[in-house]
């Protein structure tokens, strides 16, 4: 009996430690920047230099410009599912935010100000690409950057679309990032992030995890494991820096807020707060949809964008 109990204890210990073994004993998953650029660029890819960093964006279609801004841990590929009809009618520009996708972080100094850096980056994009009149669409953290852009550039941002946007009480999100405040956690990812971690994180963004396509989390994992990206994301998460929510009230342009009702990341109640604080604001709620409506409900999202832009 004692031998059986001892065996069971050892078995439980092995099972408990198996995930750690997978993390620490796995091969190096980090993808060198040059290789990532070669293998993950698109035919519409462009690269520009800003503050010593190489930054990636895509430029497709003709017509009135639409700028798409992804969220934390994502890339411009997050918008790939939007119907081709959007690109057939508009000039669609997608950016990899600094520190994500194929974009580097610029030089930040000893006391980096991440919110201001992203504000400056969007200003740079608007000026460099001559976007003197533009519609801006942002998801999650990218939504927060989008409404900052609308407040900063009321003369340029003519319409704003927020998809499950960051903006208000972020304790639900920041609490999940608490572990990243410890620098020792970063060493767990010295060899990259296993694909099962990307899968687990992305499935939480869907109302129905079975709708998440394996190709999506594999691609996301490649971008996450691009040289430098994990440490950039960890640094951003540790900073716990968030924009001043009072700035939302400065948004003047017509705004469409789209929200998946089953968002497990940012509660749907936040949509009402945007409605309250932005004077010219319409809210559209999607059933059977989580945190990324442009991925889980791409057809409905595209239709809503086209209708709003045509008004």
What are these regions (language model features)?
Residues 281-284, 288-311:
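Catalytic active-site module of serine/aspartate enzymes centered on a nucleophile-bearing elbow/loop
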Residues 50-51, 58, 97-137, 303:
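Active-site loop/oxyanion-hole signature of alpha/beta-hydrolase fold enzymes
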Residues 151, 160-188:
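Flexible "cap/lid" loop of the alpha/beta hydrolase fold
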Residues 251, 257-259, 263:
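Short beta-strand/loop motif that positions the catalytic acidic residue
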Residues 1-64, 89-90, 132, 309-311:
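Alpha/beta-hydrolase fold catalytic core
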Residues 26-31, 35-36, 172-173, 177, ...:
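Conserved alpha/beta-hydrolase catalytic His-Asp/Glu region
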Residues 143-154, 160:
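Short glycine-enriched nucleophile-adjacent loop
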Residues 58-102:
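Conserved HGGG/HGGXW glycine-rich cap/lid loop of the alpha/beta-hydrolase fold
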């Amino acid at each position: 009996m004692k031998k059986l109990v001892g065996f069971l204890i050892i078995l439980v210990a092995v099972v408990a430690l198996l995930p750690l073994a997978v993390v620490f004993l796995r091969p190096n998953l980090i993808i060198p920047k040059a290789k990532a650029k070669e293998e993950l660029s698109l035919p519409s890819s462009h690269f520009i230099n800003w503050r010593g960093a190489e930054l990636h964006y895509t430029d497709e279609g003709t017509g009135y410009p639409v700028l798409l801004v992804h969220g934390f841990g994502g890339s411009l590929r997050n918008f790939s599912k939007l119907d081709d009809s959007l690109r057939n009618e508009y000039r669609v520009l997608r950016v990899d935010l600094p520190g994500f996708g194929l974009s580097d972080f610029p030089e930040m100094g000893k006391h980096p100000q991440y919110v201001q850096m992203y504000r400056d980056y969007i200003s740079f994009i608007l000026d460099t690409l001559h976007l003197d009149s533009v519609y801006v669409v942002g998801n999650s953290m990218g939504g927060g950057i989008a409404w900052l852009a609308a407040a900063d550039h009321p003369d340029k941002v003519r319409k704003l679309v927020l998809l499950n946007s960051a903006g208000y009480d972020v304790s639900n999100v920041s609490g999940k990032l608490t572990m990243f405040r410890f620098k020792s956690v970063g060493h767990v990812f010295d060899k990259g992030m296993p694909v099962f971690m990307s899968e687990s994180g992305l499935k939480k963004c869907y109302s129905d995890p079975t709708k998440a396509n394996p190709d999506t989390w594999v691609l996301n994992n490649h971008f996450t494991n691009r040289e430098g990206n994990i440490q950039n994301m960890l640094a951003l998460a540790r900073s716990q820096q968030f924009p001043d929510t009072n700035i939302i009230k400065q948004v003047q342009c017509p705004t469409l807020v789209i929200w998946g009702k089953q968002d497990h990341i940012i509660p749907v109640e936040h949509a009402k707060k945007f409605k309250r604080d932005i004077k010219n604001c319409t809210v559209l709620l999607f059933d059977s949809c989580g945190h990324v409506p442009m991925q889980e409900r791409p057809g409905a999202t595209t239709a809503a964008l086209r209708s709003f832009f045509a008004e």
